[in-house]
Amino acid sequence: MAHVASIGTIHDDTFAFADRSKHGRSVLKAQLQTLEERTCAHPHELCTINADAAQAMSAYIDDARRDADSVGGTIECVCTGVPAGIGSGMFGGLENKLACALFGIPAVKAVEFGEGFGACLMRGSEHNDQMTYAADTSDTSDTSDATDATDATNAAAANAHDTSTCENNTNPQADAERWRRRSDAHARDVIFETNHAGGVLGGISTGEPVFVRVGIKPTPSIGHVQQSVDIATKQPALLRISGRHDPCIVPRACVVVEAMCAFTIMDMLLDEQQ
């Protein structure tokens, strides 16, 4: 599910994707529920978690429209229910495929997963997501993250390309299946205390929510007179664009980001079944 995270300098509440404690899970669950309820009750308003943020964003866009200008923003999308082991450690990684799809959306200028650029300010001891065994397996399941009950559904399947297990095996599929059977008894109890990586490690899903943030640029077609060049005369020229202009396309791109993430993950799930 996606929401408008920011328009210009106006920010909505961010998804609580990183805290995987019982409290953090409940916060994310409540955010998703609130977002769904607001979207159904107010389909013509901006898709935000915080109603006040939607009002402030709308006013910000109106200001840009009156100035014959445009604004950009960011969109956050969290994908719950993604099983562990989807993707690969090289060019077919989950992040690779998602980024490729998301950059195919016009006006997308940035894509980051998990903490993204925020990870550059963290130490490894802060960013690394610690694993543990759940004291109570039932606590790892909630409706906001359907796969927590199957959290590392085949934890070793995520390591199916591990040379230590496949090096002398001529049937990698059988090897992966054997690892699944061996790990099934205990893998369901493995949980992550945090999710700074955004649900993907080494290109492979961890079973935690996949979190991605997308940056949308301001629309270039604006009412202002802009400096350009005349290639016929080889001289500077003024560019005037007439007609109606979108002051902001972020709200409309929100559902596109959500759809692209869903299609990409579904494609990868189908590939896993082949």
Regions found by a protein language model. Name each.
Residues M1-I7, G116, L270-Q274:
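Short alpha-helical "patches" and their helix-cap loops
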Residues A135-N169:
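Compositionally biased, intrinsically disordered low-complexity segments enriched
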Residues D67-D142, E167, N171-P236:
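Glycine-rich anion/phosphate-binding loop at the beta-strand->alpha-helix junction
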Residues M1-M90:
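Glycine-rich, mobile lid/loop segments that gate access to catalytic sites or pores
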Residues C40, C47, C77-C79, C100, ...:
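Generic recognition of cysteine residues
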Residues Q55-S58, N96-F103, F211-R213, C254-D267:
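Predominant activation on well-ordered alpha-helical scaffold segments within soluble catalytic domains
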Residues T219-Q274:
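Internal helix-turn-beta structural module
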Residues S6-F17, G124-H127, K234-L239:
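Short, mixed-charge aromatic SLiMs
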